[in-house]
Amino acid sequence: MLGGTAEARALAAALAERDVPFVSSLAGRVSNPALPVGEVRVGGFGGPEGLAAYVRDEHVTHVVDATHPFAATITANAAAACTDVPLVVLRRPGWTERPGDRWRRVPTIEAAAARVAGAAPGTVFLTTGRRDLAAFADDHEHHYLVRTVDPPTSATPPRMTLLLARGPYSLDGELALMRAHDVHLLVTKDSGGSLTAAKLDAARELEMPVIVVDRPPLPEGVTAVESVEAVLSQLGLG
């Protein structure tokens, strides 16, 4: 199982309860990650060829991709590697607009940066993750409140307040944070799930505009299921 998400940890627990042998693989990009039950390996495979070799050498019968919805490279590698074994992709449902939301969806992080560049000066709450900060590095007009799990390792916005934190977050906490920093605009990826959804509720309550980066498409021929139960059914364990 390619993991690193809350859904992957829930699936690991379900497999362990059924005494199904499995290995969870984490990319190792986040410090002190929450670990699933069972055997865990950390680190990459060396592209699709390396993953295919691991699947072959370890006599893997099924692969589950339960990585982050924006881990497009890992998903592409899994699709390329799993030519002889079934691949099940687990993706939590994305977020949907509700009455009162002021969302603007964009296809890429670069499009989000371009949209911010055209916005009135103010404070931008940027929650897209540390790997995407370079897209905003040329913006000298806005101040950024950047929240990431780990410190940035690439270029960052020149006017930035960095907040290191890990969810889940509460509505009251997000409201207090946005008010304290006088946030005018929220930028987020459509990660889905409940751990970080409170920021969207806070933005709605504050009537704040939100730029939402859409998920990358799945590889051709690959479909996804949205629940642990659906994965278990695909594996014949439901």
Predicted feature locations:
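Glycine-rich, highly charged phosphate/nucleotide-binding loops
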Residues: 38-58, 164-173
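Internal active-site segments that recognize and position negatively charged phosphoryl groups
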Residues: 110-145
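N-terminal beta-loop-helix "entrance" segment that forms/cooperates
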Residues: 23-46, 101, 155-160
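Short, polar loop motifs at secondary-structure junctions
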Residues: 25-32, 90-96, 129-133, 147-154, ...
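Glycine/small-residue-rich loop that forms an oxyanion/phosphate-binding "nest" at active or ligand-binding sites
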Residues: 51-112
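N-terminal basic/disordered segments at the start of proteins
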Residues: 1-28
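Histidine/lysine/aspartate-rich catalytic loop segments that bind and position anionic ligands
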Residues: 136-168
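Short acidic-hydrophobic, aromatic-tinged amphipathic segments that line or gate anion-handling sites
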Residues: 40-44, 102-110, 223-231
